[in-house]
């Protein structure tokens, strides 16, 4: 005879030990215990409301589930791999505690819609947590941006000096990226937190269930219109993993800049001791290991998304056991994204900015060349011609190893006789930044407007 499984009525042989270990998921899906119990309590109450269970039966089941929850959170619950997953472990212990009435809990329900519910709730809970952490990081970025609204540094394209910008404006670029990440998560949550109960295995059920009642009990946005869709798709996992991957892409870019700026060749930032490490052989080293590891972990999250896309790409309708492989990629992504957002916020709070080095760097790379071109346009010269004339001025300054503003007026007028001595005020980096007051620009008023808008969003 086969060992007693909850599904074992038609089996005569026991599951091979190696197969049991290979197919079990309780080693990782136990993370869903709170959602599984919450879903089962809502299901039991709904069964009583619909007359499938008596009120007393539902009450006993709910009480038993609360006892199971207490055991799990108290560390006394015994997880059994031979029971395969979190659902069977909880149901088995429930039946031990309340007797045969516990066996009625699964009425009108399959593990197919049960796991879909549990995982939707779990993913929703976690991406809501990510959203909170993303908002916290936006707040830190906005705070540091406000402190450095008037600190200037070279803005780059192609990793080459381009135009002067304020450090505040630079930091706010990341704040806006992360705000969009938070908004994406809120949008993803609306599609994730939808109740699949009532779908059963795939075709629905003959019991008079009320999925909308369960959805209301669990603070969900609604129910499914198609039972096969409800149990067969994991697009909510894909979408959440994409959101996580996008967050990590943004964090990785910020890490890259911190790493570069910490190099003495730049010297723009001073790493806090709490977010750096040393060398086992070189006593002078202060390495940006935290930023490097975060940059490296980005690939790990990308891998989770790729793994999940590959898992679901060729599945026939409806539920397939392949879907068990949706948990570990998300769980790993969750740990990585959550920790990375929190650590980045802490690192940025303590990161030191070397304003002197940033200011000195403004002298290299002719960052004010565009100002000269715009100045010439203001003198009535077409932009393309102004661009060409400015290029000639840059070439002359480069040949003499001086800056544009160090070129004598006579040399500038030899290039274009419309240049007057008012050009030197235009070439000042601070003036260049101050003139860019259009919405979204790097000017002080624009930065202040950005900060005000982000502050309002953070207070919502």
Swiss-Prot record:
<dbReference type="InterPro" id="IPR029419">
    <property type="entry name" value="Arg_succ_lyase_C"/>
</dbReference>
<dbReference type="GO" id="GO:0004056">
    <property type="term" value="F:argininosuccinate lyase activity"/>
</dbReference>
<dbReference type="InterPro" id="IPR024083">
    <property type="entry name" value="Fumarase/histidase_N"/>
</dbReference>
<dbReference type="GO" id="GO:0006526">
    <property type="term" value="P:L-arginine biosynthetic process"/>
</dbReference>
<keyword id="KW-0028">Amino-acid biosynthesis</keyword>
<dbReference type="Pfam" id="PF14698">
    <property type="entry name" value="ASL_C2"/>
</dbReference>
<dbReference type="InterPro" id="IPR020557">
    <property type="entry name" value="Fumarate_lyase_CS"/>
</dbReference>
<dbReference type="InterPro" id="IPR022761">
    <property type="entry name" value="Fumarate_lyase_N"/>
</dbReference>
<dbReference type="InterPro" id="IPR008948">
    <property type="entry name" value="L-Aspartase-like"/>
</dbReference>
<keyword id="KW-0963">Cytoplasm</keyword>
<dbReference type="Pfam" id="PF00206">
    <property type="entry name" value="Lyase_1"/>
</dbReference>
<comment type="pathway">
    <text>Amino-acid biosynthesis; L-arginine biosynthesis; L-arginine from L-ornithine and carbamoyl phosphate: step 3/3.</text>
</comment>
<comment type="similarity">
    <text>Belongs to the lyase 1 family. Argininosuccinate lyase subfamily.</text>
</comment>
<dbReference type="GO" id="GO:0042450">
    <property type="term" value="P:arginine biosynthetic process via ornithine"/>
</dbReference>
<keyword id="KW-0055">Arginine biosynthesis</keyword>
<dbReference type="GO" id="GO:0005829">
    <property type="term" value="C:cytosol"/>
</dbReference>
<protein>
    <recommendedName>
        <fullName>Argininosuccinate lyase</fullName>
        <ecNumber>4.3.2.1</ecNumber>
    </recommendedName>
</protein>
<keyword id="KW-0456">Lyase</keyword>
<dbReference type="InterPro" id="IPR000362">
    <property type="entry name" value="Fumarate_lyase_fam"/>
</dbReference>
<dbReference type="InterPro" id="IPR009049">
    <property type="entry name" value="Argininosuccinate_lyase"/>
</dbReference>
């Amino acid at each position: 005879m086969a060992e007693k499984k909850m599904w074992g009525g038609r089996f005569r042989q026991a599951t091979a030990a190696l197969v049991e270990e290979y197919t079990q998921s309780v080693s990782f899906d136990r993370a869903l215990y709170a959602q599984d119990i919450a879903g089962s309590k809502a299901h039991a109450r709904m069964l009583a409301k619909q007359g499938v269970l008596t009120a007393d039966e539902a009450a006993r089941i709910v009480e038993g589930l609360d006892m199971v929850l207490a055991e799990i959170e108290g560390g006394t619950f015994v997880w059994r791999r031979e029971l395969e997953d979190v659902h069977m472990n909880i149901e088995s212990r429930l039946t031990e505690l309340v007797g045969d009435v516990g066996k009625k809990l699964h009425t009108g329900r399959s593990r197919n819609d049960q796991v879909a519910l549990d995982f939707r709730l779990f993913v929703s809970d976690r991406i809501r947590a990510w959203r909170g952490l993303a908002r916290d990081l936006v707040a830190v970025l906005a705070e540091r941006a406000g402190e450095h609204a008037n600190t200037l540094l070279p803005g780059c394209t192609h990793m080459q000096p381009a135009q002067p910008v304020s450090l505040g404006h630079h930091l706010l670029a990341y704040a806006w990226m992360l705000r969009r990440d938070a908004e994406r998560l809120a949008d993803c949550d609306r599609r994730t937190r939808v109740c699949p109960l009532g779908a059963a295995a795939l075709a629905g059920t003959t019991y008079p269930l009320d999925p909308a009642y369960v959805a209301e009990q669990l603070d969900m946005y609604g129910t499914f219109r198609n039972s096969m869709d409800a149990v067969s798709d994991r697009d909510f996992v894909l979408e959440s993993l994409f959101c996580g991957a996008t967050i990590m892409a943004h964090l990785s870019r910020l890490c890259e800049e911190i790493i570069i700026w910490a190099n003495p060749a730049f010297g723009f930032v001073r790493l806090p001791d709490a977010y750096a490490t040393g060398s086992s052989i070189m006593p002078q080293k202060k390495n940006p290991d935290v930023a490097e590891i975060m940059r490296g972990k980005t690939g790990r999250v990308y891998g989770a998304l790729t793994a999940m896309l590959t898992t679901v790409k060729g599945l026939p309708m409806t539920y397939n056991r392949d879907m068990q492989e949706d948990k570990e990629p998300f769980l790993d992504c969750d740990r990585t994204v959550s920790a990375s957002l929190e650590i980045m916020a802490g690192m940025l709070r303590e990161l030191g900015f070397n304003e002197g080095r940033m200011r000195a760097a403004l002298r290299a790379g002719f960052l004010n060349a565009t100002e000269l071109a715009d100045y010439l346009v203001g003198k009535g010269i077409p932009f393309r011609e102004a661009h060409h004339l400015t290029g000639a001025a840059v070439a002359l300054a480069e040949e003499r190893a001086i800056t544009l503003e160090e070129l004598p007026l006579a040399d500038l007028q030899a290039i274009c006789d419309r240049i007057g001595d008012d050009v030197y005020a235009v070439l000042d980096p601070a003036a260049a930044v101050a003139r860019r007051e259009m919405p979204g620009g790097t000017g002080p008023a624009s930065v202040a407007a950005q900060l005000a808008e982000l502050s309002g969003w953070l207070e919502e």
